[in-house]
């Protein structure tokens, strides 16, 4: 009996060793070479993993068959949009320059096609940089559409239509998200943000449907370049989810720069006419535009991945369900970025990808951490926030909340004559004195807020803000000179219920 037990034990050990020694083509195969996918591939390779990655062929406008290394952010998102924001800002700067002694004696023309070409040149440069980063990390790049065909197997359909399968110990889904259009009659006449970044002709009349950051940013961009812009959104104010006081200021700034706002209004029909695209609003009004942009949300780009067929759980929106380590219910399959629909920001995808690489290959299991994630809306002027809004703080409060605000006319505007105030705000938990939220709407808001985000991440108190010496003269110094409480919000315990 003892002999049999020993033999059985040896057999079990050999079987386990053989299972661990299973040969795979790759330690990791990544589907999607956007920000998260490239980061995960590179960092995993740096940990010693053999890595493959696939991505669709490059094109500025994405579809089910075209994409490009770099993903949405680099090719048709954050980067090209910010380039257009810079371009749009110069119009106002030229106006502001007059009171600073600059005389523009000749007519100044804006050439859309020149800016568009410079934008395309830049995203191609970045596309090539991302490819080099992968090559330098010894990551094998395959051009084609990837799909999962088993817990440890992916299939890549190449440009010529041929299909090749690869096995991998781990598979990472990093396919991002895709812009969606509401099912309004005539919706095929509208464009999404993809096309908006690559229009051949500049739209002199633009209609934007949506109240989120993409809608607000494009309204600012086109208006800054001289277009007539009408912005339609369902709520009373744009930018739902942001601090209400900041939302109101953004709305005033948009109107102050000439954007026509249509709150609590949607579109019911689009029709092609000789004069342009005719639009009918939910209030029965008619408008005509050269371009209609639908900026009404994005959805996880997972439909063609075959995930449900191999047992990977998705939520109702099609997002990949993952745990705190970005692992799906199938132990060998993971997901990061917009495909998981957690916080859909490029830096968050990078953070999740880093945590994944540490967990899967670095011997250091690391949970993705989402507290105090800063973000910005690149309208003109921009809005930036970190931590809790006033409304969120009140909702989550266990004690009294202190609100500090500072609204002022920036020094630059006092000379230029521009009537546009900057607003800065701190939210403080009175009991602990910790700063739990910060927001700013005004020039350079995003640049300033990155430093504030570090302070909040480190648990800074209001007393520490107050003891910090400011940089003078600057707008940023207001964050360390707000001494007087604007308002105190008393904590109201939620009523107990037996239901």
UniProtKB/Swiss-Prot annotation:
GO terms for cellular component: cytosol; peroxisome. The active site is at 472 (proton acceptor). Homodimer. NADP(+) binds at residues 211, 214, 217, 234, 240, 297, 376. Its EC number is 1.8.1.7. Belongs to the class-I pyridine nucleotide-disulfide oxidoreductase family. Glutathione binds at residues 35, 130. It is an enzyme of class 1 (oxidoreductase). Its cofactor is FAD. GO terms for biological process: cell redox homeostasis; glutathione metabolic process. This is Glutathione reductase, cytosolic. Disulfide bonds join 73-78. It comes from Arabidopsis thaliana (Mouse-ear cress). It comes from the Eukaryota. It catalyses: 2 glutathione + NADP(+) = glutathione disulfide + NADPH + H(+). It is found in: Cytoplasm. Catalyzes the reduction of glutathione disulfide (GSSG) to reduced glutathione (GSH). Constitutes the major mechanism to maintain a high GSH:GSSG ratio in the cytosol. One of its GO terms (molecular function) is flavin adenine dinucleotide binding. The active site is a redox-active disulfide bond. FAD binds at residues 35-36, 55, 72-73, 81, 146, 338, 346, 472. Keywords: Cytoplasm, Disulfide bond, FAD, Flavoprotein, NADP, Oxidoreductase, Redox-active center. Binds 1 FAD per subunit. NCBIfam families: gluta_reduc_2, PRK06116.1. InterPro entries: FAD/NAD-bd_sf (IPR036188), FAD/NAD-binding_dom (IPR023753), FAD/NAD-linked_Rdtase_dimer_sf (IPR016156), GSHR (IPR006324), GSHR/TRXR-like (IPR046952), Pyr_nuc-diS_OxRdtase (IPR001100), Pyr_nucl-diS_OxRdtase_dimer (IPR004099), Pyr_OxRdtase_I_AS (IPR012999). Pfam families: Pyr_redox_2, Pyr_redox_dim.
